[in-house]
Amino acid sequence: MTKKILLAVSGSIAAYKAADLSHQLTKLGYHVNVLMTNAAKQFIPPLTLQVLSKNPVYSNVMKEDDPQVINHIALAKQADLFLLAPASANTLAHLAHGFADNIVTSVALALPLEVPKFFAPAMNTKMYENPITQSNIALLKKFGYKEIQPKSSVLACGDVGSGALADLDTIIQKIEEQL
């Protein structure tokens, strides 16, 4: 049976890497459903992820094409794994504190407890190291989320430090170890 991965993409310059990630996961035989925040759509168009995942992209929690299906509940029920990559500081904060104000956070809150949940942060070093962000990460870990650590690299702003999205090979390895 094909394993179903929910790939949640939040607003980070690293969102463009979700295209390659969804493509690689699909090539490995996973069924990938992509969820996007509005901020993520500013960095990469949903159509790109739809073509590469070969599935519709969900970006509006209030859009229900089929009145018989409540998307955020249905997606959560069928997931074998949830991956937030890239995970912005904003989306991590929303998840840690139970906000369900977009498709990503609504699906995440509706996930069955036994579904493995991963997040791969991608943000400026100062944002990543901020005590508020670290507190949110600790809270998510307490709730059962697993962090795929960011790497140290030259960031979009030119700074060098921790906060770059983990290599896709690392992310995929963590997923395959879990599934």
Swiss-Prot record:
Residues at the active site: 157 (proton donor)
SUPFAM superfamilies, alphabetized: Homo-oligomeric flavin-containing Cys decarboxylases, HFCD (SSF52507)
Reactions it catalyzes: N-[(R)-4-phosphopantothenoyl]-L-cysteine + H(+) = (R)-4'-phosphopantetheine + CO2
EC number(s) reported in the record: 4.1.1.36
Amino-acid positions noted as binding substrate in the UniProt annotation, renumbered to this chain: 124
Highest taxon in the source lineage: Bacteria
Cofactors named for this entry: FMN
Swiss-Prot/TrEMBL keywords: Decarboxylase, Flavoprotein, FMN, Lyase
Disulfide bonds: none
Known role: Catalyzes the decarboxylation of 4'-phosphopantothenoylcysteine to 4'-phosphopantetheine.
Organism lineage: Bacteria, Bacillati, Bacillota, Bacilli, Lactobacillales
Stored Pfam families: Flavoprotein
Protein name: Probable phosphopantothenoylcysteine decarboxylase
Entry GO MF terms: FMN binding; phosphopantothenoylcysteine decarboxylase activity
Cofactor note: Binds 1 FMN per subunit.
Gene assigned in the entry: coaC
Keyword Flavoprotein: yes
Keyword DNA repair among UniProt keywords: no
Alphabetical GO biological process terms: coenzyme A biosynthetic process
Family: Belongs to the HFCD (homooligomeric flavin containing Cys decarboxylase) superfamily.
Pathway: Cofactor biosynthesis; coenzyme A biosynthesis; CoA from (R)-pantothenate: step 3/5
GO cellular component: phosphopantothenoylcysteine decarboxylase complex
